[in-house]
Amino acid sequence: MYKIIGKFFDEDIERECKTPDYAIGVFMAYVQKGMQYTDNYTASDAIDEAVDVSRDVYTHDLPHYHELTGDMWLELSKE
């Protein structure tokens, strides 16, 4: 079981995902959502993040942490 926790402004994020692919997809959906609120985050940055989180999930190098801004951060871990 994979778990995503984080903060999106005032919203607390807590999601459980059964498969690694689903966890990566949900994680990146939140990253994509957060990109709408940042000026210095590009599509290339999102691709780099997708590569990083996928690598960490499949090499079991978790938790994976990502911060878009101080108000928006995510952590993916395996329970």
Name what the model sees in each region:
Residues A29-E79:
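Short, mixed-charge low-complexity intrinsically disordered segments
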Residues Y2-I4, R15-C17, A23, L74-L76:
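Hydrophobic beta-strand residues in large extracellular and virion-surface proteins
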Residues F8-Y22, Q36, N40:
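A short, exposed loop/beta-hairpin motif centered on an aromatic-Gly-Thr core
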Residues M1-D12, V26-Y30:
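Short aromatic-glycine-(Arg/Gly/Cys) micro-motifs in beta-strand/loop hairpins
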